[in-house]
Each structure stands twice: as C-alpha cells, then as structure tokens.
C-alpha cells in the first residue's frame, strides 16, 4: 500500500482524550500492518490560545491569518513547539517512534510568500523526499507541523491542508483529513460516502454544503486534483472506526479528483 498522510485539525489538538484515542488506534493498526504513516498538523486553536494569553491581537484577511514579523515567533512556538511536541509525546506514549519535524526540515518543501499584506504566510510545493524516505524505512512516525522556511531563510506559516497535500505529493501517499465532522451530509443529513467536483458544486449551489464545510470540501478537492486520487474527510471522534480508515476503507466522505 502507498504511505498514508493523516492531516489533523479542528479541536483535536485541544482534546487530550481524543489524541489518546487516535494514537491508540494507530498503534492497534500498526500491530497488523506495515503501512508507512505520517501526520501533518496545524493548530489554529493552540495559536489563538497562546495569542490570547499574551494579549496579542489576531488579524485575518479573507479568512487567512495575518502573520507579521513580530508575531511569527509566537506562531512557530505554538505550532512547531506546543502542538508538535504535544503530538510527539502522545505518540511516544504508544511506542510509535515519533519524530517531530516542520516543513523546512531536510528541505521537504519549497515555500513562497503568498501576499506581503499577510506577512509570514506561504504556499509550499514538494521538494526533497530523502529525509522522509529514511525515517519511514527506519520505522519512524514523522509528525510534521505546518511551519516552513522560504528561500531567504524566513520562517513561514502554511495552511495545514496545503501542507498535508504537499507532503502526500512528495512521497506519493494517500491523504486523509481528520476533523470534527463525519463527512459531507446531503439535504436529509445522510452521510455521502463519495463525491466528485460536479456533485460538490451542485451541493454548494443548493446551499447543502455551507460555511466552514465549503472550506473543508474545497481543500480536499484541491488535494485530490493535485494527488490525482481520492482524499478522505473523516471524523477523529470514532476511534473504533479509525483502523478501518487507515486500511483504506471509507468511513466519512471520499472526495474524487
């Protein structure tokens, strides 16, 4: 099987019991599988909490966090520090051989600033898989934060969905986006197991997919097009289903390219 990139988001990083359930499911899955696994994470809730404790303002432009030079160190500390090492600690508890990384380590990705008005915010593309190839062949679990380094050596904040897509592209992996939603629901609130771009456009037009779910679905669709294969949206709240998900079964919604 291809390697599997698991993108973590939502309030999982703020929910210790959910993190424990996730890594317990990973450990159980790996008892009977030699599939290579990687985790990519953001951590907006961790950033917001730290900014609040430091009485720092949070500014956004078109839904994207503005990251000025005097705040990038705070965001790096939250994502590559607090969030990353919290996940590493939970994975270590289950003997998963975790290694905490960021997108800039080993030149995994190349980063380019999005918009000067957003500050230290960048997009990334896959660059050099050597570090991940070595770690995966050695039986390690890479846990990668969405902090990158640009060509000028500047630290950059990257959208975690795009970060996960770049890492999946780098090593030709499947991608699962874990969140606090079951998947995409139809007008009758029934879970839709598979969707393509035309169906998604119709559901958005008919206001069945709305608000934050539009962002999640479009992120998965963008990833599916880049990877040229289905990308799953699934819920981390059901640990009993996660081992099936890691094995390739659909438990949420699979977005086709």
From Swiss-Prot:
It comes from the Bacteria. One of its GO terms (cellular component) is cytoplasm. InterPro entries: AceGlu_kinase-like_sf, AcgluKinase_fam, ArgB, Asp/Glu/Uridylate_kinase, NAGK-NC. Pathway: Amino-acid biosynthesis; L-arginine biosynthesis; N(2)-acetyl-L-ornithine from L-glutamate: step 2/4. One of its GO terms (biological process) is L-arginine biosynthetic process. It catalyses: N-acetyl-L-glutamate + ATP = N-acetyl-L-glutamyl 5-phosphate + ADP. Substrate binds at residues 43-44, 65, 157. Its EC number is 2.7.2.8. Keywords: Amino-acid biosynthesis, Arginine biosynthesis, ATP-binding, Cytoplasm, Kinase, Nucleotide-binding, Transferase. It is an enzyme of class 2 (transferase). It is found in: Cytoplasm. The record marks 7, 216 as: Transition state stabilizer. One of its GO terms (molecular function) is acetylglutamate kinase activity. Catalyzes the ATP-dependent phosphorylation of N-acetyl-L-glutamate. Belongs to the acetylglutamate kinase family. ArgB subfamily. HAMAP family: ArgB. NCBIfam families: argB. PANTHER family: N-ACETYLGLUTAMATE SYNTHASE, N-ACETYLGLUTAMATE SYNTHASE, MITOCHONDRIAL. This is Acetylglutamate kinase.
